Amino acid sequence: LTPINTRTFYWVSQVGMLAGTAVYVNAGTQLARLESLSGILSPGLLGSFALLGIFPLLAKKLVGLIQARKVYAGWPKPARFERNLVVIGAGAGGLVTAYIAAAVKAKVTLIEGHKMGGDCLNYGCVPSKALIRSARFMKTVREAETLGIANASADADFGRIMARVQNVVRQVEPHDSVERYSKLGVEVIQGHARITSPWTVEIDSEAGKQTLSTRAIVIASGAAPVIPKIPGIGSVKHVTSDTIWSLTEKPERLLVLGGGPIGCELAQAFAGIGCQVTLLARSGIMGKEDADAVALVEAGLAADGVRLLKGLDTVRCEIVEGEQRLIVAQEGTEQRVEKALPFDVLLCATGRKARVSGFGLEELGIPLTKAGTIEVNEYLQTRYPNIYACGDVAGPFQFTHTAAHQAWYAAVNALFAGFKSFKADYRVIPWVTFTSPEVARVGLSENEAKALGIAHEVTRYNLDDLDRAIAESAAHGFVKVLTPPGKDSILGATIVGEHAGELLAEFTLAMKHGLGLNKILGTIHPYPTWSEAAKYAA
């Protein structure tokens, strides 16, 4: 069973079991000496049973110390530390980590090589939702006739819309600014960080290079968009979800690669402000969601003018007579018939990859997962127990709220590991795709429950029966709840429709605190509101 020599295996096993054997034999000896009921309370017996309980914990701690000593071998430990914690990256994960450390008066340094706030503030959540707001207003204007309003019209000024997007980012910036975190007690350094040992971080900033010694390090370097390796892509105008916000002129023809949440949201938003949008999703859109949810989103995309193409392989990019084109071919066919898709701008939304290069991880031998994220344990520790990772760089989720969630565990464990450590809890993770209609989910989907072999019942409430939805001419979508057979505890909930993201919070709260559908049913919901959908589903 093992490559160890039989004799070696035998004596190592015997020696390894000596301590445990001694503890158990001692407990048995004490039990054998019992002569009366009063003997149960004897110090010897109580001590023996206490040792039985404590021994596994002590053994686990000892093994951990031995493993740590082996990992740290060859790295000189500083005699003193200048910081309690150094945080690399000022996105959601890094900001929350630094905030928590400052709140307990720890000496913490936050290092950011680019913009405070990370991708969410500057390129992701905030700008995309600002753009979606403009697109949804244009949709309201187009549907004004259904509300009894005649001759409504509006022109989408692309330049002004993009300027508003940047203005929204500027309004949110103070929440994540250097000034705010400095006032909280965080030392913020704008520069590039490199881990040079388990306890030292080298910082290259405008002021020059410096090295800080620290008891613990948290890596929160985030992720970056992946640009697909398509022949000729470098010769055409292509952008990512990070760089698209620099556009100042409207792309008349926008070709979007990728059918994930980012691709779907941006495709629909740009279509909403007047772009001709083609969405190329090889395996279909939103692969993690159930078919009934996907069908409604596909209908919403089509209604807003998005042309959805599935089952196509990308072959190459080319420019013919000044026209940029993506050449595609039908997936899986022997005789590949090529087809040209002309575009003005190509948006690559084919996923994001953890930022792991340039931080010294290779030199320290910190391993990565198959997904390219930093390998961490349940406490978010890397190979080195005092080096942690959280957010997109650690996975498995790429959401701002999960980065902040992980940051609490990373910060607390980094600061108090000697006293108490906490395992990161991923049991109740909500997420929302901000298409029209929105798709919001927490817990299991039907597909996941079936794949895992989990017995379940499905309760479905269609929003075309909800009075408020009918009043707003938005009576489309559903609330779907999975429960164990014959029980009301919630395994998962999926909501598709207007305000789905807001409605999901009630189910998230219920799952987090073990509240079943009967508790939701027994709660008064004001009439007429969207929140009643949760009660009717219950």
Report the location of each language-model feature.
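Hydrophobic alpha-helical membrane segments of integral membrane proteins
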Residues: L1-L31, V63-I66
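Multi-pass membrane proteins that catalyze or facilitate reactions on polyprenyl-/lipid-phosphate substrates
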Residues: N26-A73
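Core beta-strand elements of the Rossmann-like FAD/NAD(P) dinucleotide-binding domain
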Residues: F81-R83, A207-A216, E334-V345, R383
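N-terminal Rossmann-like FAD-binding beta1-loop-alpha1 element of flavoenzymes
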Residues: R83-L110, G263-G272
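Flexible, glycine-rich terminal cap/loop adjacent to redox cofactors
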Residues: I88, A102-H114, V126, A130-F137, ...
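Glycine-rich flavin
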Residues: I100-A106, I111-K250, S283-G287, D292-D304, ...
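Glycine-rich dinucleotide-binding loop and its adjacent helix/turn
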Residues: C125, S221-Q276, L280, D304, ...
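FAD-site-proximal beta/loop scaffold in flavoenzymes
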Residues: G234-K250, L341-K420
